[in-house]
Amino acid sequence: MWAFRTARIGSLLAATSVILRRCLRLGVAMAKSKFEYVRNFEVQDTCLPHCWVVVRLDGRNFHRFAEEHNFAKPNDSRALHLMTKCAQTVMEELEDIVIAYGQSDEYSFVFRKKSNWFKRRASKFMTLVASQFASSYVFYWRDYFEDQPLRYPPGFDGRVVLYPSNQTLKDYLSWRQADCHINNLYNTVFWALIQQSGLTPVQAQQRLKGTLTADKNEILFSEFHINYNNEPHMYRKGTVLVWQKVEEVRTQEVRLPAEMEGEKKAVARTRTRVVALNCDLIGDAFWKEHPEILAEEN
């Protein structure tokens, strides 16, 4: 009796195995259908190995966006802090980013040289950074613009650029910070001429045509008593985001085995967080203070 049942179970298992193999073969055949050839049209956009991958985002039509949402001129601290919050969110979601730099309506994100994130596909780098940033901009808008409703969603375009060495990466970031200084100095003088001297935008533009850095500083100081060097670092230098170990103090209940009720005590823990700095990137001081950014690549 038992021998018969054992043989019966064995034959059922064998039949089941045959059916499963046939189903698997059918599944493979279905996956490799006649339509699969369309995959040959996909662009192979793998980034070169041993290069820093930089994704730079720029606000699309942000002059209009700033006008529609009543941004302060020449700088709106709310908008700049919102941009930084979005960039911090991107870094926290995509941990292969080692440093980011932002100014005005742009942000650059630097991925590790050794990053194999999404097989180093440029399209993945760009689209995920852009989508995370744009959605964060909408999500956190009310935290910074409490009395200003968002009239329409912002857009950001992106590009991916590869830098083969530490020096070229440092030069790229220096270039963006130099651009921040040039644009902010011009805008500071330009809007002072409009807001305080009553010039029209065209008149202010004509007044500044052909002027050098020293000329703009002289106009600010002699006509408006503004020392450009005293302007906030966030406006003049932009914002640098890096990973740093930060000590966090939290209050939690500590209970001994013999006690019914616990005692609340402050407990300190060290965590790695994204920290915003408004510092100089062009000199060597920053890189000496933060050698960990390039350390793994040396």
UniProtKB/Swiss-Prot annotation:
Binding site for Mg(2+) 2: D58, D105
Cofactor binding remark: Binds 2 magnesium ions per subunit.
Protein's UniProt keywords contain Metal-binding: yes
GO cellular component term, pick one: mitochondrion
GO process terms (BP): mitochondrial fusion; protein homotetramerization; response to oxidative stress; stress-induced mitochondrial fusion; tRNA modification; tRNA processing
Domain of life of the source: Eukaryota
Disulphide bridges: none
Entries under InterPro entries matching the protein: Thg1_C_dom, tRNAHis_GuaTrfase_cat, tRNAHis_GuaTrfase_Thg1, tRNAHis_GuaTrfase_Thg1_sf
Amino acids binding GTP: D58, G59, R60, N61, F62, H63, S104, D105
Swiss-Prot/TrEMBL cofactor(s): Mg(2+)
Described purpose of this protein according to its UniProt entry: Adds a GMP to the 5'-end of tRNA(His) after transcription and RNase P cleavage. This step is essential for proper recognition of the tRNA and for the fidelity of protein synthesis. Also functions as a guanyl-nucleotide exchange factor/GEF for the MFN1 and MFN2 mitofusins thereby regulating mitochondrial fusion. By regulating both mitochondrial dynamics and bioenergetic function, it contributes to cell survival following oxidative stress.
Quaternary state and interactors: Homotetramer. Interacts with MFN1 and MFN2; functions as a guanyl-nucleotide exchange factor/GEF for MFN2 and also probably MFN1.
Protein's name in the database: Probable tRNA(His) guanylyltransferase
Gene: Thg1l
